Structures are given as C-alpha cells and as structure tokens.
Swiss-Prot record:
PANTHER family: URONATE ISOMERASE (PTHR30068:SF4). It catalyses: D-glucuronate = D-fructuronate; aldehydo-D-galacturonate = keto-D-tagaturonate. This is Uronate isomerase. HAMAP family: UxaC. Keywords: Isomerase. One of its GO terms (molecular function) is glucuronate isomerase activity. The lineage of its organism: Bacteria, Pseudomonadati, Pseudomonadota, Gammaproteobacteria, Enterobacterales. Pfam families: UxaC. It comes from Photorhabdus laumondii subsp. laumondii (strain DSM 15139 / CIP 105565 / TT01). One of its GO terms (biological process) is D-glucuronate catabolic process. Pathway: Carbohydrate metabolism; pentose and glucuronate interconversion. Its EC number is 5.3.1.12. Belongs to the metallo-dependent hydrolases superfamily. Uronate isomerase family.
C-alpha cells in the first residue's frame, strides 16, 4: 500500500514515475493566467502568518468551510483574527477527504514549507502554524521569494483596460527580479453592456483614454488607445469571462450607435441588441489581438453571484458561483468564424466550466486551426470546478482523442494565492500517470525519449512558444 502524499503520489506505474521525476518535476512554471495582485509582487509582500497567506481571498476554501458549518465570521469576518480563521480551516480540512482541497492543502505544506509526513487538522494546527510562521518571516517566503522557490518564469495577471499598470511597470524596471509579470487584458466590463455598472465604466474608460464616448466608434477608439498602453507593458494575452455566450450578425454602425446611446441614456436593451453589441465588440477585439500576436482566452459558462444576499454582504468572487448550462456550440462557432472569415482569428484558448461541453470545445478548436501555428486554437485545461483529478483526466483524455495532446499549452493556476503553484505539480503528476498507464497497457509506445519530450513540452515549452510575440527570441 502506498503512503499518502509520498514522492510517488498519484504516480501508479513505473513509466509514470520516470516521466514525472526525470522530466516533469523540475520544469519551470509558465503561469499564463492567474489573479495575483501585481502590487503584492511589486512591493514584495511579506505575510504575517499562515492564516493570512492561506485563507485571504481563497473562495475555494471559503466554500468548503461554509459546507462544514463554519460561521461566516470565521471565514470572511473583518474583525476576526487570522489565527481564529486558521483554526476554523484546520477543523474543516479533515472533512474534505475526496475534495482536491485535501490534496492541495498537503501539497502546499510540503512546498514551499517543507512539511510532510503529518496530516493537517485540529491536533496538528498549532505545530504547523508555528513552523510556517517562522519560515514566513524569512525573505525566501515573501511573495517574490515563493515565486522564485517554485521556479516560476512568467505570470500573466488579469487586468482591466482602465488599469494604469503601474505595478507591472515597477516590476519590469526592477533588475533584482527576473520573473516576468505581464498584464492580461480583461475587457469584460466594456462588452457586457447589460450589466448595471456599464454607464459608470464608460465614464472611467473615457477618462483614462481621453476620449469622449458618444458613438460606437468612440468605444473602439478608446479601447485601441488602451490596447496600445497594454502592449507597451508587455501584454501578450487577453481573457474574457463569458457567462452567456451570445452571437448575432453584426449590424451597421448606425444600429450599434443606437444601441450604445440607448444604454447610456439608461434604457433597457433587448436580447438581440445585447447580442449585436457584444458580438461587434468581441469580433473587433479578436482582430486587434490577431494583429498584435496576442492570445485570446475565453472562460465560458459560469453562473456568478448566485446568492444575492451574500453578494450584497461580500461582493463578487466570494464563493457563490457555479456551473451554467447554456448551449454554447452554435454561438461559439459563429463568433470564431466571424474572425476567421477574414483570416483575423487570433491564437485562442477555450475553457468550459460545464464538463458536458468538453467535446464541443475540443471539436470546435479543430475547426479553426491553421496559419502554421501549432495548436492555434486550444481546448484549455480543466477550469475551476474541473480543476481536480477527474476533471483534469477528462480534459486530457478528450483532448488526446479529438485533438493533439502533444500541442497542449498545459496548466495554469487561475488563482489569487502565492501558494497555488503546487497545482502545476498536481497536474504534472496526473499527466505523467495518464501517459504511463497508456504506455504500460501497450496503447502507445513506451518510448521514454518521445514521452519525456511530450511531458516537458506540455509542462512548459509549448506555453512559452505559444505566448511568444511575433519575432520574439525564445
């Protein structure tokens, strides 16, 4: 019987063990999509204690604590001490068996804290608290120190078009820190015309872009100025959170002007008008990304802020989101084709939150390959609720069956935590185990050099190549 969290955790055959330890374990991390706060990297934040670095902003843990019956004051309470929240988490962890949080918790204790051979829970919480806090006091456990310990080469943060990017600029000019921290363009608030805050957001966009917005062309002019600002700060990717994927044929500019002006006057748009405006913005943006060599990411299918009472209390990203079930195949097909028809579809990564859509995404990606770009349109890694063992397995198997696993750009943290880099380790172990199983069953050749190269490519090389800007030397 294998021990829990041993060196061969999740590696269930000899080929898997060789692939992981000889090829995957030491590969650098190219974390192309995350939600880290660039200010914390620029200022090299030091964390006061384990509770702070572990629980602050981590809605995965918050959801589990609520399920365990923990009082909300011990989860998000502003007056509650970090130690009290930490103790509540310690009470919760033994109840999470079968949930990836149990694995992640112990992986995060092992790396970077070096704590293994001990199960986290109420009985061990104080011992672990003191050990980790002692380490957090050292420079190697600052925000930057942890990134360096985890062999991170690049992180792509998530940034609004109105952001100044001052912290990215500060990091880029700091010669003492060699990890790339690049902005990613996230224009959700400009293409989601139906949202309550749209009018106020347009005023913000007007101010930062120095453009008066009264017509649709003014929106594009303002966005183009901000795209140039992001490009000047090294941006190479855009991301879009799309709860309800819409498509409508793009009308002429007179119609788009009318839609925008109606909305800015406080009017309520029809579903057709919303779809027309959204499609027009997304297609225009996609063409802009293609011209710049950027990667377009689409995260499709979440239902956000389901609990309106808790949304009023805590705001967004607090652990009250879930999987949607809208149909996506037809609007996605038409949206991508609207860019591709003029040969202006950018490199694209598609993520679906509902696993029933895996095959839809995998087969859709193959419709729009080309341009001499390996894996131009990608079926992205298991996202959010699929960011667990079974979800990763499903994505890997369906990608391999319906596309080319060898061209996959691999894992990302999609996290707000500096301790989440162990998710790359988790993914790598699962990847190596899958390939090892196939090889040892005789389903693929047990050719160590070939398999090792595929592992190294998926862990790092493919992403580095894929996100490179035109003419960039690797």
């Amino acid at each position: 019987m294998k021990n829990f969290m041993c060196d061969d955790f999740l590696l269930n055959n000899e080929t898997a063990r060789q692939l992981y330890h000889e090829h995957a374990a030491d590969m650098p991390i190219y974390d192309y999509h995350c939600h880290l706060n660039p200010r914390e990297i620029a200022e090299n934040r030091r964390f006061d204690n384990l509770g702070q670095i572990w629980l602050e902003g981590d809605h995965y843990k918050w959801r589990a604590m609520r399920c365990a019956g923990i009082d909300e004051s011990l989860i998000t309470g502003k007056q509650t001490r970090d130690y009290e929240k930490y103790q509540a988490w310690a009470e919760t962890v033994p109840l999470t068996l079968g949930n990836p949080l149990y694995h992640w918790t112990h992986l995060e204790l092992r790396r970077p804290f070096g704590i293994s051979g001990i199960l986290f829970g109420p009985q061990t919480a104080d011992e672990i608290w003191h050990q980790c806090n002692e380490k957090l006091a050292a420079p190697a456990f600052s925000a930057r120190g942890i990134m360096q310990q985890m062999n991170v080469r690049m992180v792509g943060t998530t940034d609004d078009p109105v952001d100044s990017l001052q912290y990215h600029r500060q990091i880029a000019t700091d010669e003492s820190f060699d990890i790339e921290v690049l902005p990613s363009w996230r224009p959700d608030r400009v293409f989601k015309i139906e949202l309550a805050g749209f009018i106020d957001y347009i005023k913000q966009l007007e101010a930062v872009a120095d453009v008066s917005i009264v017509a649709f062309a003014d929106v594009l002019n303002a966005l183009e100025r901000r795209l140039e600002h992001f490009a000047a700060h090294g941006c190479r990717a855009a991301d879009h959170g799309i709860e309800n994927l819409r498509y409508a044929p793009i009308p002429d500019e007179t119609v788009l002007n009318g839609i925008l002006q109606k909305r800015l006057a406080g009017g309520i748009l029809s579903e057709l008008e919303i779809a027309q405006y959204t499609t027009a913005i997304l297609v225009w943006l996609g063409r802009q990304y293609a011209a710049r060599g950027w990667v377009m990411q689409m995260h499709i299918g979440a239902i956000r802020n389901n609990n309106s009472r808790m949304f009023r209390l805590l705001g967004a990203d607090s652990g009250f989101d879930s999987i949607g079930d809208n149909n996506i195949a037809w609007p996605l097909s038409r949206l991508l084709d609207s860019m591709d028809v003029t040969d202006e579809l950018p490199k694209t990564i598609l993520y679906c939150l509902n696993p029933r859509d895996n095959e839809v995404i995998a087969t859709m990606a193959s419709n729009f390959q080309g341009g001499g770009i390996a894996g131009k349109v990608q079926f992205g890694s298991g996202w959010w609720f699929n960011d667990q063992k079974d979800g990763m397995l499903r994505q890997l198997e369906q990608l391999s069956q319906l596309g080319l696993l060898s061209q996959f750009v691999g894992m990302l943290t999609d996290s707000r935590s500096f301790l989440s880099y162990t998710r790359h380790e988790y993914f790598r172990r699962i990847l190596c185990n899958v390939l090892g199983q196939w090889a040892e069953k005789g389903e693929i050749p047990n050719h160590k050099a070939m398999l090792g190269q595929i592992v190294e490519d998926i862990c790092f090389n493919n992403a580095r190549r894929y996100f490179a800007l035109p003419g960039e030397n690797l």
